[in-house]
Amino acid sequence: MFCHVDVKISSKRYTWTKLPLNVPKLVLIYLQSHFVLFFFSMCQSIWERPAIGRATTSSASWMVGYDCLL
């Protein structure tokens, strides 16, 4: 199982590919003096697209999406 993780914070984009998700993974991002913690559970047997989370702080906004396939 592999995942494509796309994280966009403000105008900067960070991408991880081929993350093995045979076990739950924990991704920690430190950017612009903010800690953003993402927990990716095991992918289901179907496409999960998109799984999007959004949040806004006083100085930055972030968006994350991930696509999973077997």
Curated annotation (Swiss-Prot):
**Keyword Transmembrane listed:** yes
- Mind naming one GO cellular-component term on file for this protein? membrane
Q: What else is known?
A: The microRNAs that are encoded in a MIR17HG intron stimulate growth of cultured lung cancer cells.
According to the UniProt entry, which disease involves this protein? Feingold syndrome 2: A syndrome characterized by microcephaly, short stature, and digital abnormalities including brachydactyly, brachymesophalangy of the second and fifth fingers, hypoplastic thumbs of variable severity, and cutaneous syndactyly of the toes.
List residues traversing the bilayer: 21-43
Task: Please give the tissue specificity annotation from the record for this chain.
Answer: Highly expressed in B-cell lymphoma and lung cancer.
Subcellular location(s) of the protein: Membrane
Q: Which residues lie on this side of the membrane: Cytoplasmic?
A: 1-20
* Keywords linked to the UniProt accession: Membrane, Transmembrane, Transmembrane helix
Originating organism: Homo sapiens (Human)
Q: Which residues lie on this side of the membrane: Extracellular?
A: 44-70
Gene name, Swiss-Prot/TrEMBL: MIR17HG
From the Swiss-Prot or TrEMBL record, give the protein name: Putative microRNA 17 host gene protein
Membrane topology category = Single-pass membrane protein
